[in-house]
Amino acid sequence: MMTTARTIRAFWVLLACMTPRLAHAQKTDTLGTDTTAERLGLWARSSRTSGLLLTSGKTYNRVEGLPVYIGPVFHDSSGKAAFNVSVLGIIRSADTFHWDHENLGHNLGAGMRVGRERGYELDISSYDLVAPVEKWQLPDPDAGLAAFFVRRDFRDYFNRHGAKAIGTFHMSSRSSLAVEWSDERWAAERTRSVFSVFRNGKTWRANPLVDAGRFHTAVARANIDTRNDDINPSTGWLILAEYERGSGRVTDAGLASPLARPAPVSQLAYGRALLDLRRYNRLSPNSWINARLVLGGWLHGDELPLERRFSVGGVGTIPGFDFRKYQPGTVDVSQCSDGGQPPPGNPAQCERVALAQLEYRSELHSSLLDFLNWRPIRLRGIGFTVQPTAVAFVDAGRGWLVGQPSGTLEYSTHSFPRFGTFRTDVGLGIDLGIFGIYVAKAVSSSKEPANVFLRLHRRF
């Protein structure tokens, strides 16, 4: 009975996390979709129909389990303007959906958009959410399914309770400029009793204690996308740039290594930026070479709060190195700890980070695969095929602190670490179209064993 219940639970969570990926696994399918599920379903699609919405948060983690959103949504239009209102409550599956303040949240929003592809949009929202510290490393489905199946959570989390307003100018269907202002209370979240299919008796990695307090942030964001496809691109650019100006009062400081933060401050004001630059190039009808560069970190003002710090390592960045692995006595340029015992959970502590990724992709063909793809596999009206592509990749990256130059961890404001101090790896894999299997081996630290991992999405 327990095995049956576990299988059913695994099936539902798998669909809840994977459906956005399956929906883009191949070109548009001619079979009509289930319109009932668009309005009411655990993995509701982007329906424009008003009514009652029941949907998952498209993720799974050691703090919430599976967040379930339920409430009314309203969509209307007048000429070129479209209006949206949603009133969603959140119940989380941690501690078997226990009804308490940790398991309850909300997300209320109202917005207006003028123009379909080119136009502008105004949105306001009020929320009580669990948010990841570093969302840029790994997509939600990959992070969620790793936590659900193998009890590995590749993110850290904190609570965001407040409101924000966003103004967006859409230059095209996928390129935009936006400004955002928010007033929020940030708080630490604890690791909870959350189910996983395998290794369910193992202890979760602790969720790090972050800085609690009230913060105001102003963000300017640019998203420039010239790719020919947003899921499986073969040509074009994707440029994501963000500047954040934040200020706040810390009422309860989180835990950090002595070198990363000698003494916490109660009042702070900071400037922070993040640039994610990706280029996709087709070399031939069946081969591509793609590159990614990520630069982020402190720009000015006081030190960054722990919610806004950086790290590298693990399947989302440098998979040849284990995620948040602690090696006693070793200066860690992935999390920026000085070699002593790190705080519980080994949190991200770097004030700046740099990551470079390069991959070569070559599509594979065989008569067997052509036979298997004769009729697409269908799941809820979505057809997809197996499209194997061989992948070879290299990665290099590290984080560092800003301050008085010292050793290999602290650098001055205008300095950049030598490449010889970066963590590097190489790897091979096969991308089947709906998921990929890879193996990565550390180069800069030859004693590290090879890591085998799966990805739902392409690496970048």
Label each region the model flagged.
Residues M2-W12:
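Bacterial N-terminal signal peptides that target proteins for export
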